[in-house]
Amino acid sequence: MDAVRAIASLGGVGFLRPAPGTWGSLAVMPLALLPPWVALLAAFLFTGLGYWALTRLPETGADPGWVVIDEAAGQSLALAAATGWLGVLLAFALFRLFDITKPGPVGWADRRQGPFGVMADDVIAGAMAAAVLLLLALVGVR
């Protein structure tokens, strides 16, 4: 496996079946054990590396199922807002829900072509999950 495919597949995680996107999300869950700023930094790194890798793949017009660095970026962003184990579980569940159902802006981004669309729908899904978690924290759910 070349370096670009290794990055895009998150070290081969994207080739796990079934549900490679879920495996990509699960792969970054250990970030929940670290301070939130680490997950936020990871989200930025995954986003940048993912965009870079996607511009170098021949399949840049599509969103191949084995490309899961986008899930890593979005899930990391959601985890940055998680507090406690309930928050971590909600971060995972909300991110996967928004990534799969593609509501509103997630669906808009998903319809964009190329590396931007591949990365943006997951980053937006992660931001939406983080926003829900922050709102829940404001009302005392942690």
Predicted features along the sequence, with ranges:
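Interhelical loop and helix-boundary elements at the membrane-water interface
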Residues: 1-26, 52-79, 96-128
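Hydrophobic, membrane-facing alpha-helical anchors
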Residues: 1-4, 39-49
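Short, aromatic-rich membrane-interface segments at the entry and exit
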Residues: 20, 36-43, 85-89
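Short, conserved beta-strand edge motifs with alternating hydrophobic and charged residues
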Residues: 28, 42-46, 68-69
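Alpha-helical transmembrane segments of multi-pass membrane proteins
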Residues: 32, 43-52, 79-80, 91-100, ...
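Juxtamembrane boundary at the C-terminal end of a transmembrane helix
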Residues: 133-142
